[in-house]
Amino acid sequence: METKRNQQRNQDGRTDGVRDGDSAAKRMEEGRLYFPGDEDILKEQMECMELLYDYNATRPRESARRTGLLKQMFGSIGRDCYIEPPLHSNWGGRHVYMGDFVYANFNLTLVDDGEIYIGSHCMIGPNVTIATAGHPVEPGLRRKGIQFNMPVHIGENVWIGAGAVVVPGVTIGDNSVIGAGSVVTRDIPANVVAVGNPCRVLREIGERDRMYYYKDRKIDM
């Protein structure tokens, strides 16, 4: 677990060597390089993880309790959102900002060290990962566990298929569909179907999509 590994690094006396006097928390908030094993960061993070544990321990019929917990956990969350447990998150959703009517299937992983914005009416398949955290390529900094975060923006009415991965700094436009298993490494425009590793635009959403919902099956409602 990342938090436990950072705790060990902290105990070993490995620090980021920052000389400007800014706290790790301030550097984290500003998207700069920082040491995630900082004691103050870990203390705040642990409080978030306790709420996440409570969420994942709810019984199937405790939907009202889950809704209440999400309001405590997330940076903000709109109405009628549903996230199937288990939910995995570095900060328990503290840096997640979600609109209305969002559905996420089980095993959603939110690496929310940085901000994640998810628009209204989004659907997220099982085993999707949305990550904001990265590490420098430079070996010396990585050896010290140094990290940086880049926000992810997902527009409204986006469908992300099962097993997709969205990496730090990516924006996905409104109404787009991300195919199952895709790895989204760059921005995806609005109103397109995009698939693959790396994820690329396959086509625009068009007239045929308004006539057929699957292959030759016509929309009848």
Predicted feature residues:
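Terminal amphipathic alpha-helical/low-complexity segments used for targeting or macromolecular assembly
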Residues: M1-D80, C199-M221
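Flexible, glycine/small-residue-enriched loop-and-beta-strand segment within the central core
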Residues: P60, P85-T171, N197-C199, R203-K215
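Short alpha-helix at the nucleotide-sugar/activated-sugar donor binding site of glycosyltransferases
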Residues: M123, S176-V177
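Short conserved AdoMet
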Residues: G78, G155, P189
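Conserved catalytic segment of ABC-fold P-loop ATPases
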Residues: G173-S176, P189-N191
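Short hydrophobic beta-strand element within catalytic cores of glycosyltransferases
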Residues: V184-T185
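Short-chain dehydrogenase/reductase
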Residues: W159, V177, V193-V195
